[in-house]
C-alpha cells in the first residue's frame, strides 16, 4: 500500500445464500486454447508482472483413483490462455513461468502445485494463494466463489467443475468456465491492491 492510499472497507464474510443472490459474472475477453507450441503465449505472458492462475483435472468418481492434470489457465488483462496438458507432460515453457518472478495468483494453490509436481519436479516461485491472503486479512469467507462475491460483487459459476477436461475438444462452456476462474483470481488481487489491502 502506498502512503497516499486509504483502505476501502471490505466485508469479511458472506453466506452461500447471499452469493447465490448475486448476478453471474464471467470472463468476456479473448480466450486462446493451445495444445502445444506455448512459446508465443509466454512471450506475451512474460510482459506482465501479475497473472491469474488455475488448473483443471478430469474428475474421478472411483475411490483411490487420481487423474492427471489436463489444463493450466493463465490470465493477463483482457486475455486468458488455456494450456492443454496431454499425457501428463508439462512443457518447459510452463516450468519457466512457474519458477519465474511473475506473480501467479490463484485459490487453493497447494493442490495445484502438488498435482503439477506429480508430473514434473520444479521449484514454484511467486505463487499467491488468495485463501491465505484472505486469512491474513481476517476475511472469514474463502474459496473463489465467496472471494469473487466479496471483492467483485458477482457470482462465479461452478457448473463445469466436474466436466471432462480431457475431451478432445473443450466445449464453449468449459472454455468460459476455465477462463473465468483464472481471470477472477487476477481481478480479486487487483481489487485488493486497489482498495489498499496489498
Which sequence ranges carry the predicted segments?
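Two-metal-ion RNase H-like nuclease active-site motif
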Residues: 50-58
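Conserved DEDDh/DEDDy metal-dependent 3′-5′ exonuclease domain
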Residues: 30-37, 46-50, 62-158, 162-177, ...
